Design a protein with these regions (language model features):
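Cysteine-clustered segments with highest specificity for TGF-beta superfamily mature ligands
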Residues: 247-264, 412, 423-428
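RTX-like calcium-binding, glycine/aspartate-rich low-complexity repeat tracts
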Residues: 1-2, 451
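Chitinase-like catalytic core of GlcNAc-active glycosidases
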Residues: 2-249, 253-260, 269-282
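Glycine-centered small-residue hotspots that permit tight backbone geometry or close packing
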Residues: 89, 136-141, 262, 288-292, ...
Length: 451
């Protein structure tokens, strides 16, 4: 059960460069993989961290926090680049300014001095909207923990976010207000949370359970799911499948069952960025299954750092019904969350659920270097009739598919270029009728992805 009214979203932390000593424009940079692999295409909202409160001509406003990067670039440069590149990849993406939670420049600074709190909040709200308009951004995200949650009073909370909501609602286009608390606090006005914010994504990865937020007063109809794929995280934050299993089931509160309203993932660019970005793309496919009959593992596998294919599940009968790949990362940036030195990427199944399923493991030191088989016509349908896979050592897996009922058989072989191996697949499916009136998808065309 999942509604995800507010989408599948992620944060990006502009202070950090990965790999170390790279900058935004380095070909191997975590920022370039977001563009090259079209990771941004999987995000509804991008929270850009961290913004600070600064004085303005009248009251206060926001600016991106200061940090320097190799090559003389600044966080302002990075902000400009991200806004440009993410929207080129995904014209529909929405940008949230994520506010800093510690130090002297949190949202609590809006109320510095001895002015009238309502006037201070109104001035900030006006300046905030002007900043968002000038920079092509779509809203504000509140990381509620640490200094900001300790220095701002409950009354100030209500005044500030009411003023922001009122100013947002006066605009001709929609502006969004997001609340991402690490834990409940006494300074939170929960009536304001429920009435002023568009969505609420608790940071469950910090260990506070859902029940604590609901018991504190957050409406169950507002709740989203905060996830994280950084090293050190255990289940249910160790894979896209684990997060989706939690979210898709929804949750009970009182006697009712509720959907989570969004997923918000911290973040795109830690030292585990290849794992994070690829898992995010898989999570998007789980939440928004591709509607096309065409499939291509290439973008996800590239984002993951082209890890070896280490397990296959193949469904077959007369023909090749479905394939599903599992890849294992062993590099410095794709080794998962649990300190095992490996990161597991379980891709989506391509094809239907008919035929018998066989799962086999592929040793890391004996990668698949060739696929072969037959295509042809099966009861009038052009499809892949049979598939075999061959490892570097010469070991063969298969054949899968008996070719019974086929009218034609055409042999194919796809060997990997020297020094490369099979890391995924692309192709298409076709839906065919089955005996008894049902139908299923089978593999119509298939190509190996090499890296």
């Amino acid at each position: 059960m999942a509604n995800l009214q507010n989408g599948i979203n992620a944060w990006i932390f502009l202070n950090e460069d990965e790999p170390p000593q790279t900058n935004y424009n380095s070909p191997e940079s975590c920022y370039q993989s977001l563009v090259d692999c079209k990771v941004y295409d999987s995000a509804s909202f991008l929270g850009i961290a961290f913004f600070e409160v600064i004085p303005a001509a009248q009251g206060s406003t926001i600016q991106i926090g200061n940090s320097s990067h190799p090559g003389g670039l600044t966080n302002q440069d990075y902000l400009n680049f991200v806004l440009r590149d993410a929207r080129q990849v995904n014209p529909g993406i929405k940008f949230l300014a994520t506010m800093v939670y510690s130090g002297a420049n949190t949202l609590a600074a809006v109320f510095s001095g001895s002015g009238d709190p309502q006037t201070q909040a109104s001035n900030f709200a006006n300046n905030l909207v002007a900043y968002l308009k000038d920079n092509g951004m779509n809203g504000l995200d509140i990381d509620w923990e640490g200094d900001v949650s300790e220095k701002m009073t409950r009354s100030q909370f209500q005044i500030l976010f009411s003023a922001i909501r009122n100013e947002f609602d006066r605009q001709p286009v929609k502006y969004y207000l997001s609340f991402t608390p690490a834990w409940p606090t006494d300074t939170t006005d929960y009536s304001a949370v429920n009435s002023k914010f568009d969505f609420v994504s608790p940071q469950f990865y910090d260990g506070t359970p859902l029940s604590a937020f609901l018991d504190a007063g957050i409406s169950p109809s507002r709740i989203g799911y905060g996830a994280q794929f950084e090293p050190g995280n255990a289940a249910p934050n160790a894979s896209a499948q684990q997060v989706w299993s939690m979210v898709s089931e929804g949750f009970s509160f009182g006697s009712a069952l509720y959907d989570y309203q969004d997923i918000f993932v911290w973040r795109f660019n830690s030292g585990n960025f290849q794992f994070e970005q690829a898992q995010f793309m898989i999570l998007d496919q789980l939440g928004n299954p591709p509607s096309s009959n065409i499939f291509d593992d290439t973008p996800i596998i590239n984002a993951a750092g082209n890890p070896n294919l280490t397990q296959m599940t193949i469904r077959s009968g007369d023909v090749l019904n479905a394939i599903q790949a599992v890849n294992t990362g062993t590099g410095p940036y794709n080794t998962g969350t649990q300190g095992t030195g490996t990161g597991i990427f379980t891709l989506l199944q391509h094809g239907g659920n008919s035929g018998g399923a066989q799962t086999f493991n592929i040793p890391l030191n004996d990668p698949i270097v060739s696929i072969s088989g037959y295509t042809g016509v099966w009861y009038g349908w052009q499809c892949v009739l049979q598939l075999s896979l061959t490892g570097k050592s010469g070991v063969t897996y298969g054949p899968f598919g008996s070719m019974a009922g086929s009218a034609t058989q055409n042999r194919f072989v796809q060997p990997a270029p020297a020094g490369q191996s099979v890391v995924g697949f692309s192709g298409s499916t076709v839906t065919v009728p089955l005996a008894g009136g049902s139908q299923t998808a089978i593999i119509a065309t298939l190509n190996a992805v090499f890296a």
